[in-house]
């Protein structure tokens, strides 16, 4: 089940989208958007996570700008880059932490909350995990990570990172810097050969089918081990 909701903030209500699992309850996942907003693709991944048994909340991080990306236009990449460039990073992290708190407080959530993000959202999720209590972190090619490595020591939750070896936005040299900074016993780090940035996005300009399949299998396995739905049911 999917519904539109909002996160109440001191200066307004941030729109958000909620997906419930078939059971109606489970552990929570805060799903943070790529630069294209809560796009069709992000919604499809939210549904995938809900079908695994998670309660998923995806906030509209562009809400303060009063604009969204029009996915029907040819300049979708330029739109996304422009909107992301206008966001205040610290405010966006604060909004995301508020969404995490709201998700944790929902009656459907049992068994903790995790942060999960793609691209822009991968960096936001990493920052959220550094300043708030999360049970797990999943970051797909977090685009801001090269600028956030001073926070690495503050991210203590079990973490999963995915990057492509052919990412033109985050060159392999930077990816290796990220790997060195975040490595530890609670961290899984995967490089996907030949995959570029946003390889999980089904748009032809980004998609890498083999990397998508491999990364999703690794992600679902990681979640099953480190953030299991069954444990949430037992804790309820």
Name each region found by the language model.
Residues 1-236:
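N-terminal cap/leader regions of alpha/beta-hydrolase-fold enzymes
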């Amino acid at each position: 089940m999917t519904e539109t909701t909002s996160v109440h903030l001191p200066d307004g209500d941030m729109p958000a989208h909620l997906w419930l699992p078939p059971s109606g309850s489970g552990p929570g996942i805060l799903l943070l958007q790529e630069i294209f907003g809560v796009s069709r693709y992000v919604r499809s991944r939210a549904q995938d996570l809900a079908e695994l048994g998670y309660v998923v909340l995806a906030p509209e991080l562009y809400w303060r700008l009063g604009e969204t990306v029009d996915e029907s236009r040819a300049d979708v990449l330029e739109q996304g880059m422009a909107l992301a460039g206008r966001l205040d990073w610290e405010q966006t992290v604060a909004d995301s932490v508020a969404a995490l708190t709201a998700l944790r407080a929902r009656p459907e959530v049992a068994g903790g909350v995790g942060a999960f993000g793609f691209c822009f959202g991968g960096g936001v999720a990493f920052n959220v995990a550094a300043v708030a209590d999360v049970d797990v972190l999943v970051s797909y090619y977090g685009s801001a990570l090269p600028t956030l490595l001073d926070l690495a020591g503050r991210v203590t939750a079990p973490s999963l990172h995915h990057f492509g070896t052919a990412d033109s936005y985050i060159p392999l040299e930077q990816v290796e810097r990220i790997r060195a900074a975040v490595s530890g016993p609670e961290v899984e780090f995967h490089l996907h050969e030949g995959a570029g940035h946003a390889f999980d996005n089904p748009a032809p300009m980004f998609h890498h089918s083999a990397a998508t399949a491999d990364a999703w299998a690794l992600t679902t396995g990681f979640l099953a081990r480190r953030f299991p739905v069954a444990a949430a049911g037992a804790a309820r």
